[in-house]
């Protein structure tokens, strides 16, 4: 409720009127007879209505329950949670359970960030490394190499470490003379008001050697997460020399 200015008021229990003098000999804008019009625009003093020493900086100093005036700011009450019992410090033990929940959420989030960083770092290193299979966690063993010095072909055999994936998450297919290996895992975690999502994906493509039967290619996954891919030779090239008789004609 706002105060409306008026010329007369009782304080305390006596009729007082405004003095015709605005400034007295002491320089005070107030005398013993004052109206509400004046005290509404004049700083209030804890000792009564009248001029007060502004050196206390009470208008810029936090209020104390004991009265208006300077207080010890060392209590840091402005940065301390307010309590219904009064202004001042409070017991923060009630925040313990909530703080524990927040710390647990931060721990899960940090763990998720580390997993993503490891996956992302591995992908970047595979792009920079000309021979990634010899240095990455996902190892590949490839057999069935051919050389130009011999025409004898060997069966196609390949091993890939996919132990981070479940069997239903690994797919192998043949397309355009290549063996394509694709594995993908998605994790969703919901709890304590937090939602987390992570994705791990692995892709590899291998060229089938000439003469290998893609239709007879097989793949199997062992218990320790090793993917075995085999393809037999379809056509064997005979490198034996064949003698061609030469007929010599004699002309007379």
Curated annotation (Swiss-Prot):
GO BP, sorted A to Z:
negative regulation of apoptotic process; protein refolding; response to heat
Question: In the UniProt record, does the keyword Cytoplasm occur?
Answer: no
What's the chief localization of this chain?
membrane
Occurrences of domain sHSP (ranges): 138-249
Q: According to the lineage, what is the superkingdom? A: Eukaryota
Q: Where is this region: 3 X 19 AA approximate tandem repeats?
A: 37-93
Give the sequence repeat ranges: 37-55, 56-74, 75-93
The protein's topology relative to the membrane is:
Peripheral membrane protein
Which keywords accompany this UniProt record? Answer: Acetylation, Membrane, Muscle protein, Repeat
* Record-linked Gene3D superfamilies: 2.60.40.790
Supply one GO molecular-function term. unfolded protein binding
Disulphide bond pairs? none
**PTM annotation (N-acetylserine): residues:** 2
What GO cellular component entries does it have?
Answer: cytoplasm; membrane; nucleus
For whether the record's keyword set contains Acetylation, the answer is yes
Q: Where in the cell is it found?
A: Membrane
Q: Report quaternary structure and partners.
A: Exists as an oligomer.
Explain the purpose of this protein. Answer: May be a component of myofibrils where it acts as a stabilizer.
Family to which this protein belongs: Belongs to the small heat shock protein (HSP20) family.
Q: What is this protein called?
A: Body wall muscle protein HR-29
Q: Which organism is it from?
A: Halocynthia roretzi
């Amino acid at each position: 409720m706002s105060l409306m200015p008026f010329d007369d008021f009782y304080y305390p229990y006596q009729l007082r009127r405004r003095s015709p003098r605005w400034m007295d000999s002491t320089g005070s804008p107030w005398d013993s007879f004052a109206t509400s019009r004046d005290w509404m625009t004049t700083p209030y003093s804890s000792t009564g209505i009248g001029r007060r020493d502004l050196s206390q900086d009470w208008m810029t100093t936090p209020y104390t329950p004991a009265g208006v005036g300077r207080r010890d700011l060392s209590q840091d009450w402005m940065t301390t949670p307010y309590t219904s019992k009064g202004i001042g410090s409070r017991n923060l033990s009630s925040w313990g359970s909530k703080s524990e929940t927040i710390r647990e959420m931060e721990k899960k989030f940090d763990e998720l960030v580390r997993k993503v960083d490891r996956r992302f770092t591995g992908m970047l290193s595979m792009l920079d490394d000309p021979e990634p299979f010899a240095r990455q966690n996902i190892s590949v063993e490839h057999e069935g190499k051919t050389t130009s010095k011999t025409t004898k072909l060997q069966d196609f055999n390949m091993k890939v470490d996919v132990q981070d994936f479940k069997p239903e998450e690994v797919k192998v297919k043949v397309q355009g003379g290549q063996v394509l290996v694709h594995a993908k895992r998605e994790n969703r975690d919901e709890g304590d008001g937090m939602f987390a999502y992570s994705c791990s994906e692995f892709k590899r493509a291998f060229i089938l050697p000439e003469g290998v039967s893609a239709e007879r290619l097989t793949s199997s996954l062992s218990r320790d997460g090793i993917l075995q891919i085999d393809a037999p030779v379809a056509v064997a090239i005979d490198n034996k020399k064949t003698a061609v008789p030469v007929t010599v004609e004699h002309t007379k």
